[in-house]
C-alpha cells in the first residue's frame, strides 16, 4: 500500500516544486476517517498481483537496484526536510500562542481601563449630596461677602462726597476770610499812607526801586546763564574743529605718502622707459633687429606706465589740494570759535559787573529803607506820645512798656528839659473787648493760612537776601532786638502783671505775623 501523509504534516512535492526557501504550509483540514477515503482522494487504489511465472532477468535486476538506492536517498532527505519543517511549524505555533496571550492581556487591560474611565465619569457626573451642599453654602457666603463689600464701597463713596463738600465749604470760608484780610490790609495801608503823606510816597518809591533792582539782577542772571550756554556751545564747536583738524592732518599724511608712492612709481616707469630706449639704442648700434610685434608691445607697456604715473600724480596732487582747502576751512572755523569765545567771555564779564553793581545798589537801597523805617518809627512814637494822655507809670524801670486794662501798649514820651530828660507813659487809643476778641480770632485763622503761604512764597527781603552778603549783619541786628524784647518781657513779669505780660507776648507775635503778611503782599 501507498503511504499517505498524516494530518498536520507537510506535502513534500509542493515544497520541492516551490523551493526549499519558502515557508511550510500547515494542513489544517480534518483527519481521514478511513483508508478508502484517503485512497480515493489521492487517485484511487488497485489490487496487487504477484508475477511468479515471469522471472526477472539479471539485467533488469541490475537496473532496478540503483533506482531503489536513489529513492532511499531521496526518502532520507525528505525525512530530514520533514523534521526541519516540523520544527519550524512548532516555533511558529509557539509564536502564535505567545501573540494570542499578549493579545488577551491587552484586551483585559483595555477592558479594565474602560471600566475605570466609565466609573470616574459616573462619579464625576453624580456628586454626593454633601459636596453639593458645601458648594451651595460657599456660594452663599461669597454672595454675602460681595454684598457687604458693595455696601462698604457705597459708604466710602458717601464719606468721600461729604468730605469733598466739607473741603469746598472750608475753601470758600478761607477765600472769604482771605478776601477780608486783604481788604483790611488795604484799608490799613491806605490809612497809613494818608497819615504819612509824603513819607509813604517815598516808601513806595524805595520799594519800586528795590523791585526794579531785583528785576535787573534777575535779567543779569539770565544773561549770564545765556553767556555760559554760549561758551559751552563754543567749546563744543572748538572740540569738533579740533577733531576735524586731526582728520585733516591724517589725510595730509596719507596724501604725502600717496605722493611719494606716485613719485616712486614715476621713477620706476622712467627707469623702465630709459631701459627700453637704451636697449633700443643699443640694438640700433649693434644692428639688432626686433620684430614689429615686440616693438608694439614694448611701446604699449611704456605708454601704460606713463599714463599710470600721470594718473597717480594727478590723484595725489588733487588730494593734497583738498587737504589744504579743508585745513584752511578748519583754521577759519577755529579762529571764528576763538573770537566767539572771547566775545562770550566779555559778555560774561560785563554781566558779572552788572550783577555786582545791582547787588551794591540793592544793598544801598535796603540800608536806606532800614534807616527810613527806623526814623519813621521814632517819629510815630513821638507824635503818638504828644497826642495821648498818660495812664500808668513804672516806679522801678522807666524804659519798660506798660499795658492798659484792655491789653494795649503804653508808649513813652520823651520830655527834654533844660537839665535832664524824663519819659512819660502815654496811652494809645483804646479798643473794645469785642474788637480785641475778633482781632485775635482773625489772626488765629490767618496764621494757619500764612504758614502754608510762607512755605510756597518768598518775601522780597528773602529774595534779595540770597544775593546780598550784608543781610547776615541785619539778621544779627534783628536777633539782638528780639533778645532785647524778650528780656523786657521777662522784666515785666517781675512787676506782677502776669496777665498783661501774656497779652503783650501774644500781641507781639501777632504783629510779627502782620509784618510778614505785608512783606508777602509787597
Swiss-Prot record:
Q: Does the keyword Coiled coil apply?
A: yes
Write down the superkingdom of origin: Eukaryota
Alphabetic keyword roster: Coiled coil
The similarity comment for this entry is: Belongs to the WEB family.
Q: What is this protein called?
A: WEB family protein At2g38370
Q: Where is this region: Disordered?
A: 1-32, 374-397, 458-493
InterPro entries associated with the record: Web
**Pfam families to which the protein is assigned, alphabetical:** WEMBL (PF05701)
Q: What sections of the sequence does the record tag as coiled-coil?
A: 77-264, 299-376
Q: Where is the composition biased (Basic and acidic residues)?
A: 473-486
Amino acid at each position: 500500500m501507498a503511504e499517505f501523509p498524516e494530518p498536520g504534516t507537510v506535502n513534500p512535492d509542493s515544497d520541492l516544486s516551490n523551493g526549499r526557501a519558502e515557508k511550510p504550509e500547515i494542513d489544517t483540514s480534518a483527519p481521514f476517517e478511513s483508508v478508502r477515503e484517503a485512497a480515493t482522494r489521492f487517485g484511487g487504489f488497485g489490487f496487487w498481483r504477484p508475477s511468479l511465472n515471469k522471472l526477472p532477468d539479471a539485467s533488469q535486476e541490475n537496473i532496478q537496484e540503483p533506482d531503489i538506492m536513489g529513492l532511499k536517498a531521496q526518502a532520507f532527505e525528505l525525512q530530514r526536510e520533514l523534521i526541519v519543517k516540523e520544527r519550524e511549524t512548532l516555533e511558529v505555533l509557539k509564536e502564535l500562542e505567545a501573540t494570542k496571550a499578549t493579545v488577551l492581556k491587552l484586551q483585559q487591560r483595555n477592558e479594565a481601563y474602560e471600566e475605570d474611565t466609565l466609573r470616574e465619569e459616573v462619579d464625576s457626573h453624580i456628586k454626593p449630596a454633601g459636596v453639593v451642599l458645601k458648594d451651595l453654602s460657599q456660594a452663599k457666603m461669597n454672595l454675602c461677602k460681595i454684598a457687604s463689600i458693595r455696601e462698604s464701597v457705597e459708604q466710602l463713596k458717601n464719606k468721600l462726597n461729604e468730605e469733598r463738600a466739607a473741603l469746598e465749604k472750608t475753601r470758600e470760608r478761607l477765600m472769604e476770610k482771605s478776601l477780608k484780610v486783604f481788604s483790611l490790609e488795604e484799608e490799613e495801608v491806605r490809612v497809613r499812607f494818608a497819615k504819612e503823606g509824603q513819607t509813604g510816597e517815598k516808601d513806595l518809591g524805595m520799594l519800586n526801586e528795590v523791585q526794579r533792582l531785583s528785576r535787573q539782577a534777575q535779567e543779569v542772571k539770565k544773561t549770564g546763564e545765556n553767556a555760559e550756554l554760549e561758551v559751552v556751545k563754543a567749546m563744543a564747536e572748538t572740540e569738533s574743529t579740533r577733531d576735524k583738524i586731526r582728520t585733516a592732518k591724517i589725510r595730509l599724511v596719507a596724501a604725502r605718502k600717496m605722493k611719494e608712492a606716485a613719485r616712486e612709481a614715476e621713477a620706476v616707469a622712467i627707469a623702465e622707459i630709459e631701459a627700453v630706449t637704451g636697449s633700443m639704442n643699443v640694438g640700433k648700434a649693434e644692428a639688432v633687429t626686433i620684430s614689429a610685434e615686440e616693438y608694439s608691445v614694448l611701446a604699449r607697456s611704456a605708454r601704460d606706465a606713463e599714463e599710470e604715473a600721470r594718473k597717480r600724480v594727478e590723484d595725489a596732487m588733487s588730494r593734497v589740494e583738498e587737504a589744504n582747502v579743508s585745513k584752511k576751512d578748519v583754521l577759519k572755523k577755529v579762529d571764528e570759535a576763538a573770537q566767539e569765545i572771547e566775545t562770550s567771555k566779555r559778555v560774561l564779564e560785563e554781566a558779572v559787573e552788572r550783577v555786582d553793581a545791582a547787588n551794591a545798589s540793592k544793598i544801598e537801597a535796603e540800608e536806606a529803607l532800614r534807616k527810613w523805617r527806623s526814623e519813621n518809627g521814632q517819629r510815630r512814637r513821638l507824635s503818638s506820645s504828644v497826642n495821648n494822655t498818660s495812664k500808668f507809670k513804672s516806679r522801678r524801670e522807666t524804659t519798660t512798656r506798660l499795658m492798659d486794662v484792655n491789653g494795649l501798649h503804653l508808649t513813652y514820651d520823651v520830655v527834654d528839659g533844660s537839665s535832664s530828660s524824663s519819659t512819660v507813659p502815654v496811652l494809645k487809643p483804646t479798643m473794645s473787648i469785642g474788637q480785641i476778641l475778633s482781632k485775635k480770632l482773625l489772626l488765629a485763622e490767618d496764621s494757619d493760612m500764612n504758614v502754608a503761604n510762607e512755605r510756597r512764597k518768598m518775601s522780597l527781603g528773602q529774595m534779595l537776601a540770597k544775593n546780598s552778603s550784608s543781610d547776615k549783619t541785619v539778621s544779627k541786628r534783628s536777633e539782638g532786638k528780639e533778645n532785647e524784647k524778650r528780656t523786657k518781657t521777662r522784666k515785666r513779669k517781675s512787676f506782677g502783671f502776669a496777665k498783661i505780660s501774656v497779652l503783650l507776648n501774644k500781641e507781639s507775635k501777632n504783629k510779627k505775623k502782620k509784618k510778614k503778611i505785608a512783606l508777602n503782599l509787597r
